[in-house]
Curated annotation (Swiss-Prot):
GO molecular function: small ribosomal subunit rRNA binding; structural constituent of ribosome
Protein name: Small ribosomal subunit protein bS6
The encoding gene: rpsF
PANTHER family, alphabetized: MITOCHONDRIAL 28S RIBOSOMAL PROTEIN S6, SMALL RIBOSOMAL SUBUNIT PROTEIN BS6M
Keyword Thylakoid: no
Summary of the function given for this chain in its UniProt record: Binds together with bS18 to 16S ribosomal RNA.
Example of a GO cellular component annotation carried by this entry: ribonucleoprotein complex
Length: 109
């Protein structure tokens, strides 16, 4: 492998992602905004950005997750680098307010 090919394989490009975050229904609005701000800051550090944020609100879960039957849903479309998504996923996994989350790469079809 040539040196230029090796460099190209290490360069991360921005990709389109959709992220759904399900929070506990008792999460204060300020905490919801703080979580979204943290996600935005993480992707902005690597030149990414939100393209759309929709608060779907409180909805019944399809099945019981832990002790929760309802969750507060937030849907986010964004441009981000894969390393940003890994960091966001780690941060959301350790947050006590987050019941579940899923990031989908929309560039892969």
């Amino acid at each position: 492998m040539a040196a230029s090919e090796l460099l190209k394989s290490r360069v991360e490009n921005l990709r389109d992602y959709e992220l759904v975050v399900i929070l506990t229904t008792d999460t204060p609005k300020e905490k919801v905004e703080a979580i979204l701000e943290g996600i935005s800051k993480t992707i902005a550090e690597k030149e990414g950005s939100f393209t759309e944020v929709n608060h779907w609100g409180k909805r019944k879960l399809a099945y019981l997750i832990g002790r929760y039957v309802e969750g507060y849903y937030v849907f986010i479309k964004m441009k981000a680098k894969p390393s940003s998504i890994r960091k966001i996923s780690t941060d959301l996994r350790i947050s006590e307010q987050v019941i579940r989350h899923m990031a989908i790469n929309m560039d892969e079809e």
